[in-house]
Amino acid sequence: MKVEKRQLQFDQKLEEMGMRIKDADQLKVKEDVFDEITLLALYRLVHKKWLSAIGGSISTGKEANIFFGERGNLNVAIKIYRIRTANFNAMSEYIVGDRRFSNVKKNRKDLVFAWTKKEFSNLSRAQEVGIPVPEPLVWDRNILLMSFLGEGERPYPQLRLAKIMDPESVYKQLIECIDTLYNKAELVHADLSEFNILYGDRLYLIDMGQSVTRDHPNALRYLMRDIKNINRYFRTRCAIQEDIKIFSKITHLDTIEP
């Protein structure tokens, strides 16, 4: 009964904002997601006409939940970073050393806000150089709105779950993406794997909140880790290049300092 009452109160709050609720039975109240700060950010996005409807959950990650949404006739993805349960230490590793966020206060709320802004910025830089990523639309506090990648209301599958007819071609595209990201966008994804790549009409890199600039103290280490992850996944699926050869071609360095 308490859960149903809380669900009703939550639905009423969203409706008061002017937001239409889709698939209400799938939109379960999660106290660690829809807190007062998140509801306020949602209200601001609805008020500014960025959102008109919210639907069911698309995915639940370590730090964020993603929901299906609508902006008029446009399908969007609503990424909400959880403030109460965010892994402060894990996030700090990627924020500290990033010159763009050197003034961030060391508390959980401000770190999550900075992280959301950071992902928006990283996606924008990647998109500018032609990397296939979800289009970043707007961010507010701990909420990031992006274009929805999928067919109808069904998201594209992660690479690990997709049926790929030509894995060698996909592998080459990914190595090219890593190169372009590093040399043109001056970014390193820093968590690239078969879990953070979607595959539909083409491949897409996602989850770029942790991505760092090329001058980050750990950028080269993260770059090598990305290369190793992609090689690990494709090793039994097609011919691959050696880790160090890819690394050297991208960075023009022969080795990486431990």
Regions found by a protein language model. Give the residues of each.
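Long, low-complexity intrinsically disordered regions enriched in Ser/Thr/Pro/Gly
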Residues: 1-17
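Intrinsic disorder/low-complexity detector
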Residues: 6-7, 29, 36-43, 47-48, ...
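Polybasic/polar functional segments that serve as interface/processing modules
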Residues: 17-18, 22-30, 222
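Conserved ATP-binding subdomain of kinase catalytic cores across diverse folds
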Residues: 22, 29-155
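Short, glycine/acidic-enriched loop or turn micro-motifs at the edges of active sites
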Residues: 82, 150, 194, 199, ...
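Conserved kinase catalytic-core helix
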Residues: 107-135, 139-140, 156-190, 195, ...
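Short small-residue beta-strand/loop micro-motif enriched in glycine and branched aliphatics
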Residues: 154-159, 213-216
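C-lobe/activation-segment region of protein kinase-like
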Residues: 170, 182-189, 200-258
